[in-house]
Amino acid sequence: MEVILLEKVRNLGNLGDKVHVKSGYGRNYLIPQNKAVFATEQNIELFQKRRAELEKKAQQALANAEQRAAKLNDTTIVISAMASDEGKLYGSVGVNEIKDALIEKQIEISKREIVMPEGPLHSIGNYVVEVHVHSDVVANLQVEIISAK
């Protein structure tokens, strides 16, 4: 199925690109999330008329994401967790704990923006966690895990 992207989609294309996607991906994700429309003649003409408006909206979203990333890059969060004498945690520190610590600092973030490719953290120490605030903007958040005794 052919669709026209209304915003940049990671690993697919940019605003205004006409791309071929599987029917399920288009109908169940891209179109309901307003990330794309069917590539009909009528939609192509409508998109050409709205292109400047959509590009301006995308630029505003990018500028907003860069501001959030700058704030996150300057932030260090400290998470206290129960740990053994060797520094191993009794459990782990994952996305939920990081999100809760950021909310305590009045920084709004969603769980899906936090990326931990190696999985949850299992020991005391300092870590850098990636936060994908936009498809083009990645912030590095400093996380310090200390022992709660």
Swiss-Prot record:
Gene3D superfamilies documented for this protein: Ribosomal protein L9, C-terminal domain, Ribosomal protein L9, N-terminal domain
Entries under Pfam families matching the protein: Ribosomal_L9_C, Ribosomal_L9_N
GO BP term (any one): translation
GO CC annotations, alphabetized: ribonucleoprotein complex; ribosome
SUPFAM superfamilies in the record: L9 N-domain-like, Ribosomal protein L9 C-domain
Domain of life (superkingdom): Bacteria
Keyword tRNA-binding among UniProt keywords: no
Keywords (A to Z) from UniProt: Ribonucleoprotein, Ribosomal protein, RNA-binding, rRNA-binding
Molecular function as annotated in GO: rRNA binding; structural constituent of ribosome
Stated role: Binds to the 23S rRNA.
Family recorded in the similarity comment: Belongs to the bacterial ribosomal protein bL9 family.
Family matches, as PANTHER family: 50S RIBOSOMAL PROTEIN L9
Protein name: Large ribosomal subunit protein bL9
Species assigned in the record: Legionella pneumophila (strain Paris)
Gene (UniProt): rplI
